[in-house]
């Protein structure tokens, strides 16, 4: 019988995010201040974003640690199954192995909570410090 789904055990879930910028030859240009057309500073961005989110956005480090609290929330619905698309492979008559992530198993049925959870975490962390 062919294996259709691969489910990563909880013990093997990532504890760090991979930052693709670290491997880019041509790194993205910094965001510009619309008034001055100059690169924005962390201080200017602090009016819109939590400090840790800004640091990550501007980081060139290859890996960024995922806070344990975020990892615990991820474990509620992850890991999402990696599914082999045998039917598509056959229809395309390709020797390639085609896989897709089935994000429908998450509470909202998509990947959006994967970024929403850490954004909310950092916003709550920094706003509760200021309160």
Regions found by a protein language model. Name each.
Residues 1-3:
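Extracytoplasmic/secretory-pathway segments with low complexity and glycosylation-like composition
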Residues 30:
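Glycine-rich phosphate/pyrophosphate-binding loop at beta-loop-alpha junctions
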Residues 126-131:
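Conserved small/polar residues in nucleotide/adenosyl-binding loops
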Residues 10-23, 27, 35, 48-121:
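Positively charged, low-complexity intrinsically disordered leader regions
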Residues 33, 37, 41, 45-46:
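Glycine-rich nucleotide/cofactor/substrate-binding loop typically near the N-terminus or early
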